[in-house]
Design a protein with these regions (language model features):
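Conserved donor NDP-sugar-binding/catalytic core segment of glycosyltransferases
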Residues: 91-131
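Glycine-rich, basic loop-to-helix element that forms the pyrophosphate-binding segment
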Residues: 58-75
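A recurrent flexible, glycine/aromatic-enriched loop bordering the glycosyltransferase active site
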Residues: 65, 143-168
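Short, acidic, metal-binding catalytic loop of nucleotide-sugar glycosyltransferases
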Residues: 21-30
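A short, conserved alpha-helix in the catalytic core of glycosyltransferases
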Residues: 156-174, 180-209
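Short aromatic/hydrophobic "clamp" motif used to bind/position activated sugar donors
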Residues: 80
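Active-site donor/metal-binding and catalytic loop motifs
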Residues: 116, 181, 203-221
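A conserved acidic beta->alpha catalytic loop
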Residues: 29, 37-46
Length: 279
């Protein structure tokens, strides 16, 4: 099964080379790779041309939302995968996602591969195991030997990359909302748009794995206040969306349901309403 893999990149060529290399050698199927080159001051545009990789370009950093939207215009496959440029896809990552697709009724769902990260960020959805934090000290051999033995169950609450969604639904919800540029909280906003369209399957697939170097580019940009934007747009806090809707980080238990009107939900709703009025 062929995917259209969208990778935004901002002067991060060494990680991008690793990312593309891993997709090419560790995928079970040939995929369409589309890079959005932000600025490209480090030679990224020239390199992707030499590699005959499809790409879109902006002379400045367009931010995640605009970048993935521009790249998605070139997507030809039925399924779009949004992947970060500091990710290393592990063997059969795509085959396992394709198998998962065949088990899900319909095409309205979000799936994520499971990230392995070198240090603990408090994210219950990832596996913590250090195989290097930079391209130059990446222990690829050890990772390939050990990644499949790292313990993790399927988890609920898929919203972040590597994220897979049918192109029909990507287009129906309008891709990523550019009012969230440069991108803080844009993953949750996209998931909430999918929820509003009736999507109730947000599954993190344990056996499909990528190594994530956690190379932060957000420190180089002026951040949008995504939490307040999300609250004003949807009337709930992101923490409510994670806890009551997505059950993020909990063992996967099937399609999600609308949150029951319990006292904790009521209390959080009241606080969210007050915060929205004050913001």
């Amino acid at each position: 099964m062929k995917f259209s893999i969208i990778i935004p990149s901002w002067n991060n060529l060494e990680f991008l080379k690793l990312c593309i290399s891993a997709i090419r050698k560790n995928s079970s199927y040939p995929h369409q790779i589309i890079v959005h080159v932000n600025e490209g001051a480090d030679g990224t545009a020239q390199w992707v041309k030499e590699q005959e990789i499809e790409f879109t370009f902006t002379p400045e950093n367009a931010g995640i939302c605009r970048a993935v939207n521009q790249a998605s215009e070139l997507a030809a496959a039925d399924y779009i995968v949004y992947m970060n440029d500091d990710m290393y896809a592990l063997p059969r990552w795509d085959e396992i996602l394709a198998d998962e697709i065949s088990k899900v009724p319909g095409d309205c769902f979000m799936l994520s591969s499971t990230m392995i990260e070198p240090y603990d960020t408090g994210n219950a959805c990832v596996i913590v195991a250090d195989y290097g934090r930079f391209a130059e000290n990446f222990n690829e051999k050890k990772l390939l030997e050990e990644f499949s033995s790292l313990n993790k169950k399927d988890w609920s609450g898929s919203t972040w990359p590597p994220a897979l969604v049918h192109r029909k639904w990507w287009e129906k919800v309008g891709g990523y909302s550019e009012e969230f540029s440069p991108g803080m909280s844009s993953d949750d906003d996209f998931a909430m748009k999918m929820w509003a369209e009736g999507c109730r399957i947000f599954k993190g697939v344990s056996a499909s794995r990528v190594y994530h170097f956690v190379s932060k580019s957000t420190g180089r940009v002026v951040r949008n206040n995504g939490r307040i934007q999300f609250l004003k747009k949807w009337g709930i806090k992101q923490s409510m969306f994670h806890r009551f809707y997505l059950h993020r980080g909990e063992p996967y238990a099937g399609a999600l349901k609308d949150p029951p009107f319990t006292f904790p939900y009521f209390a959080e709703s009241v606080l969210a309403h007050i915060q929205k009025q004050l913001s």
